[in-house]
């Protein structure tokens, strides 16, 4: 047994030696191939240089003599060169040879034969290789077909008239095409190409004349900040011939028809219903009277729904009649079935959906959880009817959603942001809205509050105009009313119940506390309530949620976070844990309107249990105090004196006109850049310029067209001297007339302004004083001209770009190469001001200040900075679920992978180009046991890893 074991060991050692030998032989063969290729490249470059010298010599001879037909020689050279081994179309390691090779090819081509060494090497290479070279296989399969296409395009261009073949520099059309392609390739790479080639790419005067570099900052901001909402083209319905469909599917039964007006009014009063509109159908009493199919009625019976709820009793006949409807009802009032049942009946009345068709029914909801809930309710009825329903929402795998849409679905339940993503993907080939004839917007008030107005508007614009539209909302604020007027046609309004009021079983406590005292108070509340049950803390932003979670972890409190950036499975798990036994609600950040406060506080005190809610508010947030005081009064709770004082003080300011009421919320944070905002932006910019002392004249108004570049330094000194001379002339004239007026220099560009005392003793003393003052001004202007030399400066606003774009554009790794290349100084100025926050009197939004010795250097720097910003914005826009709603997109990103071996598990971390680590989902790959860790970024340097 021992001898056999020894033999096995020897065999393993022998196999290891053989393997090492094979590796060495393979390495040697690759080295030889590399050396051969290097020698080929060297010989080819030398031959190119000789050909260039020969071409120049021919040009000189042609210019001196009668002129030899260089074009014919060049054509012969091209045909001969096609038979030689060259590196045309490949990237050379040395950039200096690129431009030389292009000039040589354009002037005369390659006419001389390559050295015999290269030819011998070409012949011997296939004999030495036992198999096809991978590079040659790649070239023959991928590159050469593309080269053939380009040659065909060039040949077609060469067949054009001679006047169109070349430019003023004598370059051929082929040269222009190749230069344009390479130029586009360099720009697409997103890197600064320094050296001669960079100058040719970025300093081309022709490009500066008519290219995109002349666009002003406003146009640049509008183009770069164009969201997926704006990239979704608006459909021209006049050019589409839609198939007709039937809306009215309701037949009123005899029992309902025989009801008198008084009976209907009494019945609606008992149901707490209020309706507004013309020819409103009467409410029903039983399910049989609704006009639904027998299969739907059987499913309703199996689910145990005995009779319609108030909103269902009135909404079903209205929607089944084909009328547009507005339903104002609280959450949990049964409004989901009020639009789901008519939608199912509407879908069954239409031709079946085939692959490639879009949905017939479209339901939009604000949150993922509500989408899942509506989808679950529809599935209960759709199975018996043979109807497919797809839920489209963020935080989950988009691939499965796309595959289900491609197979065909009659009903789609979606969040607006993810639906825009799907419609923009693959140029709209995945799905479309051409067949949507039944549109539902559920909880429209919450969608506006979350900033979905741009997405909703664009989706509605892309559906057919004669659709049936249903809108449900907990309240009916002005923003929702404006949308209803736009998208609904003669709607019927249904209101169920009264105004939302906080449950009287919930004890509400409002404390006036500054920001720096809230965390300690929160710890005190946790110490008191932690053992009694679960606690829910509300904050304004995702970042604050994550930072507060980290702080509570450090204090030893086990807790979970819930926000839009979390994975869907994490959200569902967290919600499942907090569905019951919730005892305390803490509004760490004050709600911004009354309804939001009611929704937050209403999470506790369910099923007749007592609840407790604590809300923090500071003196700076006094605009929200009246809503809190009103909520306490309506729920019959005592209003604290300090809160009442805050509310009274703010309302007094509103009456005086120094403050403006904050409204009812529901403005959202979505990006809505229309013409009115464009004009408001320009007006604010001009007002800010006047505040900082800039004179508003014609040159300032035209600065946008010139890129905003202005002259400074020496030019300012010249203006100061000219203004001083004008002031001297004016002062002398006034002194001569002995006017008792006070003369003051009005030079805005100089450093000193000296008043002259009125009622001077005599004219001579006044004139001498004026002359002395003017001499001082002229001297200061000359000193300024020497200290501050003539230069150019421009500004670039970056405050409104995404966080990753701002970080990238202000980092020294980005600014350093641009400054070295353009010889312009770039500094970051201003402070970051979030969207929605009012800019202070002495504040400016974050911007880059660019100054350089020449106007060209400043323009180059600004153009390159714009390119970097545009790349970052496009990168963020292309991420799944990154429809811009004024918040930084939290989504899965792709970069390069780094494997970290941890025992039998492997951690894969995804790093972006700028070094930021992002969250990725755990998964298993084939036979590998791979566990991906969630990496939460606390700051650029420190991060925590959790499974």
Swiss-Prot record:
A Pfam match: KH_12
- EC numbers listed for it are 3.6.4.13
- The Acidic residues compositionally biased stretches are 1-14, 88-108, 196-219, 697-706
Q: Where's the motif Q motif?
A: 285-313
> Does this UniProt record's set of keywords contain Nucleotide-binding?
yes
The biased composition feature labelled Basic and acidic residues covers 15-31, 42-61
Q: Which GO terms describe its biological process?
A: mRNA splicing, via spliceosome
Q: Tell me which UniProt keywords the record has, alphabetically.
A: ATP-binding, Coiled coil, Helicase, Hydrolase, Nucleotide-binding, RNA-binding
Which segments constitute the Helicase C-terminal domain?
A: 479-647
Start-end of Low complexity biased regions:
62-82
The UniProt annotation puts the region (Disordered) at 1-132, 159-221, 658-710
Q: What class of enzyme is it?
A: hydrolase
CC per GO annotation: nucleus
- Gene3D superfamilies the record matches: P-loop containing nucleotide triphosphate hydrolases
What reaction is this protein's catalytic activity? ATP + H2O = ADP + phosphate + H(+)
Positions in coiled-coil regions: 854-879
Q: Does the keyword Coiled coil apply?
A: yes
Q: What is known of its domains?
A: The Q motif is unique to and characteristic of the DEAD box family of RNA helicases and controls ATP binding and hydrolysis.
What PANTHER family does its record include? ATP-DEPENDENT RNA HELICASE DBP3
The family assignment reads:
Belongs to the DEAD box helicase family. DDX46/PRP5 subfamily.
Protein name per Swiss-Prot or TrEMBL: DEAD-box ATP-dependent RNA helicase 45
């Amino acid at each position: 047994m021992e001898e056999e074991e020894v033999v096995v060991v020897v065999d393993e050692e022998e196999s290891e030696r053989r393997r090492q030998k094979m590796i060495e032989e393979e390495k040697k063969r690759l080295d030889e191939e590399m050396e051969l290729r290097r020698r080929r490249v060297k010989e080819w470059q030398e031959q190119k240089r000789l050909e260039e010298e020969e071409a120049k010599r021919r040009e000189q001879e042609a210019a001196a003599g009668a002129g030899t037909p260089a074009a014919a020689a060049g054509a012969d050279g091209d045909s001969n060169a096609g038979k030689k081994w060259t590196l045309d179309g490949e990237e050379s390691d040395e950039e200096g040879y690129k431009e030389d090779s292009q000039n040589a090819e354009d002037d005369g081509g390659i006419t001389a034969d390559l050295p015999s060494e290269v030819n011998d090497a070409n012949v011997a290479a296939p004999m030495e290789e036992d198999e096809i070279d991978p590079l040659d296989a790649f070239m023959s399969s991928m590159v050469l077909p593309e080269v053939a296409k380009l040659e065909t395009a060039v040949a077609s261009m060469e067949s054009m008239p001679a006047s169109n073949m070349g430019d003023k520099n004598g370059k051929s059309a082929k040269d222009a095409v190749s230069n344009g392609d390479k130029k586009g390739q360099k720009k697409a790479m997103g890197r600064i190409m320094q050296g001669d080639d960079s100058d040719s790419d970025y300093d081309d005067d022709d490009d500066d004349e008519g290219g995109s570099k002349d666009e002003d900052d406003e146009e640049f901001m509008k183009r770069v900040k164009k969201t997926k909402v704006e990239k979704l083209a608006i459909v021209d319905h006049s050019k589409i011939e839609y198939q007709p469909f039937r809306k009215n599917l309701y037949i009123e039964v005899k029992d309902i028809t025989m009801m008198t007006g008084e009976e209907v009014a009494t019945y609606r009063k008992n149901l707490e219903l209020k309706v507004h509109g013309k020819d409103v159908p009467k409410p029903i009493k039983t399910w049989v009277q609704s006009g639904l199919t027998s299969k739907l009625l059987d499913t309703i019976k199996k689910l145990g729904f005995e009779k319609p709820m108030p909103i269902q009793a009135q909404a079903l006949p209205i929607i089944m009649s084909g009328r547009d409807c507005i339903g104002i009802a609280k959450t949990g009032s049964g409004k989901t079935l009020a639009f789901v049942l008519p939608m199912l009946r509407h879908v069954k009345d239409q031709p079946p959906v085939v692959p490639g068709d879009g949905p017939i029914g479209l339901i939009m909801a604000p949150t993922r959880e509500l989408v899942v809930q509506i989808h679950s309710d529809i599935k209960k009825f759709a199975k018996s009817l043979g109807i497919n329903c797809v839920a489209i929402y963020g935080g989950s795998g988009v691939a499965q959603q796309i595959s289900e849409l491609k197979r065909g679905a009659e009903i789609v339940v979606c969040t607006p942001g993810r639906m825009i993503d799907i419609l923009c993907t693959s140029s709209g080939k995945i799905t479309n809205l051409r067949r949507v004839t039944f549109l539902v917007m559920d909880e429209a008030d919450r969608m506006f509050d979350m900033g979905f107005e741009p997405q909703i508007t664009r989706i509605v614009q892309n559906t057919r105009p004669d659709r049936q539209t249903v809108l449900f909302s907990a309240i009916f604020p002005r923003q929702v009313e404006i949308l209803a007027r736009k998208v609904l046609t003669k709607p019927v309004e249904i209101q169920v119940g009264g105004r939302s009021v906080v449950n009287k079983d919930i004890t509400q406590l409002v404390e006036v506390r500054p920001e720096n005292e809230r965390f300690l108070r929160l710890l005190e509340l946790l110490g008191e309530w932690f053992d009694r049950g679960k606690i829910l803390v509300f904050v304004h932003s995702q970042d604050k949620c994550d930072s507060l979670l980290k702080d509570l972890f450090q204090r030893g409190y086990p807790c979970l976070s819930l926000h839009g950036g979390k994975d869907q499975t994490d959200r569902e798990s967290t919600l499942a844990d907090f569905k019951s036994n919730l005892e305390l609600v803490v509004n760490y950040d004050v709600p911004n309107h009354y309804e939001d406060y009611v929704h937050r506080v209403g999470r506790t005190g369910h099923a007749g249990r007592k609840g407790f809610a604590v809300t923090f508010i500071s003196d700076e947030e006094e605009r929200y105090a009246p809503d809190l005081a009103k909520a306490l009064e309506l729920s019959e709770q005592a209003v604290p004196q300090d809160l009442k004082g805050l509310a009274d003080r703010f309302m007094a300011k509103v009456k005086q006109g120094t403050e403006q009421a904050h409204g009812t919320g529901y403005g959202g944070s979505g990006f809505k850049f229309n013409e009115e905002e464009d004009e408001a932006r320009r007006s604010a910019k001009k007002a800010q310029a006047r505040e900082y002392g800039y004179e508003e004249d014609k040159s300032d108004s035209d600065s946008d067209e010139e890129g905003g570049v202005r002259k400074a330094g020496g030019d300012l000194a010249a203006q100061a001297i000219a203004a001083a001379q004008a002031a001297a002339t004016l002062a002398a004239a006034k002194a001569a007339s002995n006017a008792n007026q006070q003369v003051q220099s009005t030079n805005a560009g100089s450093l000193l302004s000296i008043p002259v005392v009125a009622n001077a003793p005599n004219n001579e003393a006044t004139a001498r004083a004026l002359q002395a003052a003017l001499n001082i001004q002229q001297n200061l202007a000359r000193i300024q001209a020497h200290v501050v030399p003539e230069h150019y400066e421009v500004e670039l606003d970056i405050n409104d770009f995404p966080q990753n774009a701002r970080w990238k554009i202000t980092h020294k790794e980005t600014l350093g190469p641009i400054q070295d290349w353009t010889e312009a100084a770039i500094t970051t100025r201003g402070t970051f001001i979030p969207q929605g926050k009012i800019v202070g009197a002495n504040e400016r939004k974050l911007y880059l200040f660019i100054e350089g010795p020449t106007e060209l250097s400043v323009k180059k720097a600004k153009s390159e900075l714009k390119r970097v910003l545009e790349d970052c914005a496009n990168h963020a826009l292309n991420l799944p679920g990154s429809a811009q709603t004024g918040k930084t997109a939290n989504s899965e990103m792709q970069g390069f992978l780094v494997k970290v071996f941890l025992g039998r598990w492997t951690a894969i971390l995804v790093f972006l180009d700028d070094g930021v680590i992002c969250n990725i989902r755990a998964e298993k790959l084939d036979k590998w046991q791979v566990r991906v860790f969630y990496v939460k970024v606390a700051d650029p340097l420190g991060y925590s890893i959790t499974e």
